[in-house]
Amino acid sequence: MREETRQIFLQTIDSDAGKRSIAEAMLMDLEKQPGFVMSLPHTCMKDGDPIVKRVAAIYFKNAIIKQWRSNEYSEARKYLVENILDLFLYGDEVTRTAYNAILVNIFNNEKLSDLDGMFRKAAGFMRTSEANHVLTALNMYERVFDAEKIKYNLEQVLGLMFDTAGKDILEKVYGFLESGNYGMVKTGMIVLSKSYCYYSIPDFLSAIGTFSYVFNLSLRILNLEGSNEDLLESKKWAAYFMYKSCSKGIKKFYKKSELSEYITDMNRFQMVYATFLKIIQERSQQTIDIELYAIDFFVLLTSDADFFRYMEPNLSYFISGYILPLYSLSDSEEDDFENDPDKYLREKYNFFGNGLRSSLNTLFCEIISKVKQKEETFQGIISYLLSILGGSKETPSRDNIRAAYGSFFLLASIKSTLMKKARNVLEYIVANHVIPALRGNSCILKSQACYFLSTIEEDLPINGLALEALDNTHKLMKSSHRALMVESTLAMSFFLFNEASSEKFRQLIPETVESILSLSNTYNLEPLTMLLDSIIGYYPEEISKYAPELVGSISRITLSHLMNESDVGEDKQMVVSGFLRSIESLILSLDQRSLVLKYSYVNSYDVISFILKEEKSDFYQEALDILNGYVYMIKEIEGSMWGLFQMVLNLPIDEITVYSTEVADLIDNFITYGKTSVMDAGILGSICSVISKLCLCNEENFLDEDFIGGCRIIESIILNIGNELLSKDPSRLPLFISVAISGEKMIDEDGPAIVYALELIMNCFILRPKETIRILREQKYLQSFFEKLFSQKNKFKRVHDKKICMLFIGTICRLQDGALPELDVHGLGEVLVATVTSLPEAIRLRNQMKDDEDAPPPLVNTEDDQCLDASDISCTDILEEDIYFETELDKFEPFGYISSILSSPASGTYAEKIISTMTDEQKDSLSTVLNGERIIQKI
């Protein structure tokens, strides 16, 4: 049997697809036999053939994780919880990988109370003198931090871990450090540093004796010399502990103030500072991971005035001896610029690629932010960086040019601070260093001069020099040097904002756009797509002249990127997304219903179709937004749009729920502009299927956002084709009402979803009052509906909401008294008065927003502004007015409608009854609005 099993495993990697398929099917069947799977650690996972061992280990891991909850594996599950540490103990590198995955699975799926035995066994291993036993225990502790679900209970887990083995962990790590066993030190430091990372830590770790022990251990490790790989890893985790501990101490995040006081003690903190300073002074390529934590530590110091004083004596070193040299042109960059410009550009503009420079940029900007109010210090740093540029200009030696390259980088990173605090300095840099560099002899400084220009997003008054800068930049666009072609094209963004050169720049827009598109065929550079988007936004009239051709070019380039399967990664995703956003921006800048729009749609059909047909899910949102934009702007449905629409409707439920808002917008637009064409059985069936997927699901999968999307689709159906649909198929009405009733039981009533649920029922009522009353009674929901409506009336804030309320109340007013014995007439009267009297102000607000729509947005500088955190972002629970939300109700005149009903109520109707219950004050309020000047909603 063992030989047969070996052959099956070998056949899973056979070059013959048929054999692979048969072997995989056999293994799937064998997976149902726990006895077979559990035999593998003692058979094939010990095989002499490394291929058999590896395949068997992978299969064992996957089978155990997949079947973990099945009844057939209950005994196997129990066995593994009790014996996984023993399996790991006697495993090797291959099998231990599988056992680690199972360990994480155990932590994710088993109750902590059921793992007590495992932790006690690990504690026993920690007390032995056998290194392999200790490694097994430490490895188990490390796996705790890989388990997502157990993290929610981490304080208890850490309590169990350190209550049973805390003292032994400390002693063993110290012992391994003494003996030079850095592999074990590394694992121990991972466990200790990650354990101290959390806000809530158990008593053992909170004890000052333990904390001081780990602190001194980390400090000692950081000061060790050597290039041993495990030692460097140990130092990395010691640096992590030290940085995190100092951060918690400075911010007073420790529950025990004693720990914060210990770590921030002046003498002790000075030792930490000196240690991190030594790390950056003695830096090497091997120690970059450690160095990054040192930089994080220094950034931390800039956040607090009391601790920044530690850095102040060394500011000159930080700028001139550390940051600038690492930003200066390196040998490899110089070689790439000349011989591999593709690599040079890729690394220069890859925002995620160079962690060291990114961290250094943060440190430099934080230092500038801290000293900008200290005039002498601030001016000293700026003067130093300018002197570097001046030295290169006067004596263009190789070393001076390299330093100037870095100085341009650093000055560009603080250009917003310079714009606010020292605008004259920025003007000086452009006039005296950027423009001379553009016309100079050094290609690499031309590159940096272009880079510097590309970062400035405000009008810089450099008078006639602006035209000279534009001419020189334009010449570089025609250069044969690929890097200079790209960077000079990007530098054209400077002239978007420069008034003095705006007319000349307009003439160069076609050439600039052509350069962007040509270069985008070769480079996955997001700044190119961002520049294109900016040109479209700032010069819509110029762009619209050849919009179809531009859309076609962008679509072809985007398709080529999408079809290139070998081209993967974040850069590609950002570039493709950027191009798709450019198409969307372009079509929204064109005149509605224009032929240019229709031609543009034809030219972008292929890329939208490809994304949907080939399931390029990373770009679904962009494709949906583009298609939505076309339908909304053209105001009719082009023939081929129906095919794209059907593809969207057929998306898997997981994708529809991710993009429920976009899908709802699209369906709304197709219904609005397609009208009764949507009533095609296939299309309508697919739309109703989407509604069911979004709204009629169990509570576990229910989301308010999805429910809102479904309600919006139903509302669009009712407002646009409601009568036609219900005349043809009355069974749709119960479906719509059931969506509201079932959803109302699961939504968050404090959020906006309740408004959609109530309005859905009101819309059904307006369209078919008697049938709606009957269905609500059958569902025993009529009374609840009115109670919800009255209690939630203050949430109907939008003009759209108030118009629905008035139509709904108007429909009730026409019913004969007695048709709704469940109705609280007085309560409905209050809703009527509140709605009518608040509607004029709501319309004024919406009209004002319409008038303000074209107001230019304020320019925002980011680098020295505070970043918004979650508390700064308002996520309102009340629906706010949205001028881009358009429906058939926009044309409805509500004041005349309700006035005609109330001014001469039919005898025996609810209108008569509602009026009779009103107070004189309520009647006067209504009269003032209905008989006064009527505010008309702008469309």
From Swiss-Prot:
Function: Active in protein import into the nucleus.
Protein name: Probable importin ECU10_0620
Cell location: Nucleus; Cytoplasm
Domain Importin N-terminal: 23-90
Key words, A-Z: Cytoplasm, Nucleus, Protein transport, Transport
Biological processes annotated in GO: protein import into nucleus
NAD listed as a keyword: no
Statement: the UniProt record of this protein carries the keyword Cell cycle: no
CC annotations in GO: cytosol; nuclear envelope
GO terms assigned for molecular function: small GTPase binding
Domain of life from the UniProt record: Eukaryota
Organism: Encephalitozoon cuniculi (strain GB-M1) (Microsporidian parasite)
Chief localization: nucleus
Pfam families reported for this sequence: IBN_N
Family: Belongs to the importin beta family.
